[in-house]
Amino acid sequence: MSDVELFALEYTQGYYFKKEKKWYSLAFIKRENAWTQYKPKIEDAKTAFYAIYDAASKEEDLLLRCSMYKKSLESGQIFLQRLEYGRILNSEKEAEYKEDRKVISGIPALIEKEKSSCTVFIEIQGDYERIVQSALTEVFKNSGFRVVRSENEAAYTCNAYIELNISGAEPLAIKPGIEIRIDNNHKQTIFTNQINSTEKTLAYSLEKAQKKAFPLFSETISEELKTEFADRF
């Protein structure tokens, strides 16, 4: 059995098979008719895709452009799904969309190209032995962005502020949280996130608490940002 949903079915006149006491009819598809009926669905998906894709190509901010290309790729997948069904109905007519397929297949390379121009300077407050700084640097690099050493070189500044959220004494407890904001050179905020440690860390000195908490906290930051960057950019 096929799981393909049949479209624009037509049927022959039914006939009665006396021996089985059943009616039978043959189902068939006229490809031209089926294509004519299904084509508007393809065109709707095409229009939706190019609305996002064209807007992305006109966006001046690099990160926003990456994000919009990512959205256009998601829309493009819907377009491709409808084309695949259209190919079943009429492969010759579907072949007329080959240039659109090329446009969609080229989007990942476009995104990577834009990312390589997204230079990022990381400015962080409240870190311990640069543990979170290193984690943020790795996330940006692994996501395709380029981290630079000075703000003058950067197209974007990643401002990060860590709050320890100290409570108690002897032992004291900390439960770090971080606020992250990415601004472009025009002071426009492009990305924000707030990440909190999943548990408190107890110790008899602040330094020992930080030493224990920050490696685990940096892993939490890395995992969440890696996922969010992959989804958005």
Feature annotation, model-predicted:
Residues 1-25:
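Mid-chain, structured segments of secreted extracytoplasmic proteins
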Residues 3-11, 120, 147-168:
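A short, hydrophobic beta-strand-centered structural micro-motif
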Residues 16-19, 23-138, 230-233:
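A structural "domain/chain start" motif
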Residues 18, 167-171:
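Short, solvent-exposed beta-strand/turn "edge" segments of beta-rich domains on protein surfaces
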Residues 42, 125-133, 173, 203-214, ...:
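Solvent-exposed, acidic/flexible segments
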Residues 151-156, 182-189:
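A short, structured loop/turn motif at beta-sheet edges
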Residues 173-184:
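A short beta-strand signature
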Residues 184-229:
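Short secondary-structure boundary motifs at beta->alpha junctions and helix caps
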